[in-house]
Each structure stands twice: as structure tokens, then as C-alpha cells.
């Protein structure tokens, strides 16, 4: 097997209009795609007979190639799950910034809920950088990360 890249990250959301307003209008991402999917293809892919989905794709305006895909399952309707980061399978997506304090203050002024102010990373490969977790409208954890002055965060 040869994997050649990562296409996108996807989150299931409860209300596409609310999520789109958050990711596009609050975080400043650009809408690159919006489609409705139903029928045999999507039923087979997701494994739900009668599936009907609204899907959007977003990118950062900075030119990053990574796509964030948001999916609202209209059929079947999903259930809320416990998204605390300690739970197995709980996702989070990290956004890199060169000024975490400014980004933190701007997002807080827009009503974004943070788990803490930016925290300095004390040790390890990212020592000297800063991280802060915040939540989207569905409670999905997102992260702001400012790399250490010595260079960008390594994956």
C-alpha cells in the first residue's frame, strides 16, 4: 500500500449555517465547495441507507492546501457525543498563528469560548511556543498554536 497524502479533515456538524458562519465569518476561512449528496453513491460510502448530506469545504486564506470539510447529516440525524479531548476518537484541529495573543483576543471579542488563555509550552520539541484550545459551535475542540521562535512545529 502506498498512501500519497492527506486530502482533508472532516467534522460532522449539527447546523451547517451556524458552523459555516463560525468557520467562515469568525475564523476567516474561505468557502471553496458546497454540495448536497444523496443516492446510492453516498449511501454506500457512509454506510447509511437513505443518507442525505450537506457538505462544505473551507480553506485558510493564507494559502494552506489543507481542506476542512463540514458535513451536516440530514438523514440520518446524528447524536451529540462527548467531545472532551480525553475521550477516544475525540478530534481536534490545530490552526497555526504567528501572534497567538492577538488571535486569542480577537476570537474572544467575537464570543469564542476558550478552555484557557494561551499557555507557554515548557518542554519538548515545541518548547517556547504557545497553545490554546477553543471550541466551535458544536463543542469540537480547535487549537491555536504559535510555534517557538526556533521554527515551526514538527508533525
Stretch-by-stretch model annotation:
Residues 12-64, 109, 125-127, 133:
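Core segments of cupin and vicinal oxygen chelate
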Residues 83-85:
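Catalytic core of non-heme Fe(II) oxygenases with the double-stranded beta-helix
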Residues 89-92:
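Eukaryotic phosphotyrosine signaling hubs
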Residues 2, 11, 34, 68, ...:
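Vicinal oxygen chelate
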Residues 39-44, 76-81, 121-123, 152-153:
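A short, acidic/glycine-rich surface segment
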Residues 61, 71-75, 147:
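Generic beta-structure capping elements
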